[in-house]
């Protein structure tokens, strides 16, 4: 018997978003054609990109794939756990994954009551983020207080895998060199 969390898209959410984006596109078209100086802002292209991003986020299989990739990359990382995806129960509109039994990192007093060292926790979050970015080139790009939890045994557990980052080998090397420059106070490297 396993406890799971289920994320379900609201009924008609795609239709609602598309109607809003249609209105935004019309506004972008009007502004860009009436105020010539706004052409350089490429408002129509911005709305088109927003539509593409929104359509991807409306398919929960993409979020599941991102969570699964992070899970595979970090399954041996001490102190960091990603919820497992249950693919047999996941679809375009439904995401099924392990339930998080933890405390949000915004609940400082509750964390302290479990003897969680807040400064160490902050350091650990940064180290995990950088490890994922530099080692794997794939990282959770939305690690705010609402998306990070801590289990009773001190593991950091992220949720919401809709916004992820990817770095190619060259950018990972560049990031590592910048970080090394900061650590060594070699600001020419930075």
Feature names for model-found ranges:
Residues 1-190:
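Conserved catalytic cores of large enzyme domains
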């Amino acid at each position: 018997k396993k406890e799971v969390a289920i994320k379900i898209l609201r009924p008609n959410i795609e239709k609602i978003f598309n109607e809003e984006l249609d209105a935004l596109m019309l506004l972008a078209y009007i502004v860009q054609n009436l105020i010539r100086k706004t052409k350089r802002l490429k408002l129509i292209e911005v709305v088109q990109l927003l539509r593409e991003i929104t359509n991807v986020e409306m398919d929960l299989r993409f979020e599941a794939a991102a969570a699964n990739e992070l899970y595979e990359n970090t399954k041996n990382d001490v102190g960091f756990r990603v919820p497992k995806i249950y693919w047999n129960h996941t679809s375009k509109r439904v995401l099924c994954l392990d339930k998080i039994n933890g405390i949000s990192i915004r609940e400082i007093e509750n964390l302290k009551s479990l003897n969680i060292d807040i400064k160490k926790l902050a350091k650990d979050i940064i180290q995990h983020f950088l490890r994922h970015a530099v080692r794997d080139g794939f990282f959770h790009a939305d690690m705010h207080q609402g998306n990070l939890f801590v289990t009773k045994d001190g593991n950091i557990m992220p949720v919401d895998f809709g916004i992820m980052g990817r770095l190619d080998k060259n950018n990972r090397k560049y990031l590592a060199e910048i970080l090394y420059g900061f650590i060594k106070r070699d600001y020419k490297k930075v």
